[in-house]
C-alpha cells in the first residue's frame, strides 16, 4: 500500500491567511524551524498508478499539481484519482469537491449522515448535479467493510469515532455515529493496515483495539493543549468543543499513542497554533522521543 500525504494542516492551512500568531508569523519570516502546509487530505493506492482520495481539501488543486503521482499523462483530460472517500462533512475536508467539478462525475463514498449534511446545510451534492453528472454517492455503513473498483486490493472499514459534527450541521454538539469515521485501510495482498483518523475527539475501547492492530497510524494532531486557542489569543473553542483530543494533556493523545504497538505513528491535521509545527520546540522533541512523527505535505508512506 502506498500513501501520499497531500495536505497536513488543519482548517485554514499553515500559515493561516489572516493569522499572525507566533507560528504563522514565524514560518513567514523564517524565525522558526517550520514549513508551510496545506489543508488535510491523503491519497492511497494499491499499485502506485490508481489512487483513492481520502477527503477533498480546499487546497486540492494545488495538491494535485504538487504530486505527479496523481497526474494522468497521455490523455487530453483526466486524473489518476478514481474514487473519493469522505470521513466527515467538515468544510476543510469537503470544499475541494467544488474545485474538482471539471472532472465530474466523481464516485464519492460517505456515510448517510455526511451525505445529509452535504445535501442540506452545505449542499455540494446538489450544486454539482449541474456538472456532467456531479457526485455519485456510495453509502458507507459504519463498522462494515467496502472496496472501490479503482484499487481492488484495498479494503476499507468505516469506524465510528467520537468527535463532532461541523458548525453548520443541525447535529453540532449532538453528532450521530456516522458524522465522523476513521478508516481502517487494509492491503489484502500484503496484509498491511493503515488506520486513518484526521478528526478524533476521544478514542473509545473498540477504537483503541483497532488502533492496536494497525501497522501505521495517521492520526489527528490538531492541538497540543485543549485550551490552546484561548491561550494563543485567537479563539475561545477548546479542542473538545471542536471534537479533537489534545496531544499534551494528561492522558492525551501523545500518551495513548505511546502505548500502542504500531511501527509508525504519524500526526496529521495540525492546527496553525500547535507548537509541534516548530521542529525545534520542546513539544516536537517530546513527540520524537516517543517515536511519534509529524506528517508534512508530500510525505510518502509505504506499507
From Swiss-Prot:
Record key words, sorted: PQQ biosynthesis, Transport
SUPFAM superfamilies reported for this sequence: Metallo-hydrolase/oxidoreductase (SSF56281)
Highest taxon, organism lineage: Bacteria
Gene name of this polypeptide: pqqB
Keyword Acyltransferase: no
HAMAP family tied to this protein: PQQ_syn_PqqB
Pathway(s) of this molecule: Cofactor biosynthesis; pyrroloquinoline quinone biosynthesis
Record keyword Iron present: no
Name of this chain's protein: Coenzyme PQQ synthesis protein B
Species: Erwinia tasmaniensis (strain DSM 17950 / CFBP 7177 / CIP 109463 / NCPPB 4357 / Et1/99)
Function as written in the Swiss-Prot or TrEMBL entry: May be involved in the transport of PQQ or its precursor to the periplasm.
Cited PANTHER family: COENZYME PQQ SYNTHESIS PROTEIN B (PTHR42663:SF7), HYDROLASE C777.06C-RELATED-RELATED (PTHR42663)
Pfam families registered for this protein in UniProt: Lactamase_B_2 (PF12706)
GO terms of biological process kind: pyrroloquinoline quinone biosynthetic process
Family note: Belongs to the PqqB family.
Amino acid at each position: 500500500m502506498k500513501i501520499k500525504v497531500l495536505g497536513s494542516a488543519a482548517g485554514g492551512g499553515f500559515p493561516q491567511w489572516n493569522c499572525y500568531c507566533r507560528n504563522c508569523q514565524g514560518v513567514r519570516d523564517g524565525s522558526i524551524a517550520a514549513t508551510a502546509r496545506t489543508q488535510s487530505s491523503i491519497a492511497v493506492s494499491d499499485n502506485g498508478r490508481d489512487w483513492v482520495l481520502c477527503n477533498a481539501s480546499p487546497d486540492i488543486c494545488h495538491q494535485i499539481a504538487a504530486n505527479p503521482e496523481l497526474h494522468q499523462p497521455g490523455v487530453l483530460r483526466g486524473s489518476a484519482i478514481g474514487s473519493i472517500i469522505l470521513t466527515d462533512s467538515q468544510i476543510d475536508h469537503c470544499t475541494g469537491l467544488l474545485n474538482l467539478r471539471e472532472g465530474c462525475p466523481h464516485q464519492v463514498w460517505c456515510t448517510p449522515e455526511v451525505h445529509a449534511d452535504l445535501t442540506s446545510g452545505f449542499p455540494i451534492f446538489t450544486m454539482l448535479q449541474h456538472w456532467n453528472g456531479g457526485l455519485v454517492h456510495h453509502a458507507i455503513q459504519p463498522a462494515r467493510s467496502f472496496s472501490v473498483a479503482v484499487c481492488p486490493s484495498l479494503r476499507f472499514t468505516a469506524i465510528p469515532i467520537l468527535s463532532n459534527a461541523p458548525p453548520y450541521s443541525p447535529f453540532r454538539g449532538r453528532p450521530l455515529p456516522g458524522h465522523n469515521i476513521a478508516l481502517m485501510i487494509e492491503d489484502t495482498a500484503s496484509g498491511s493496515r493503515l488506520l486513518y483518523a484526521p478528526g478524533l475527539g476521544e478514542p473509545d475501547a473498540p477504537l483503541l483495539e483497532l488502533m492496536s492492530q494497525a501497522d501505521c497510524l495517521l492520526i489527528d494532531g490538531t492541538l497540543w493543549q485543549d485550551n490552546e486557542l484561548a491561550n494563543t489569543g485567537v479563539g475561545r473553542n477548546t479542542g473538545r468543543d471542536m471534537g479533537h483530543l489534545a496531544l499534551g494533556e494528561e492522558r492525551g493523545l501523545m500518551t495513548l499513542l505511546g502505548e500502542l504497538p504500531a511501527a509508525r505513528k504519524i500526526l496529521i491535521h495540525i492546527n496553525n497554533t500547535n507548537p509541534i509545527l516548530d521542529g525545534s520546540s520542546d513539544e516536537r522533541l517530546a513527540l520524537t522521543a516517543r517515536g511519534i512523527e509529524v506528517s508534512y505535505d508530500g510525505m510518502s508512506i509505504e506499507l
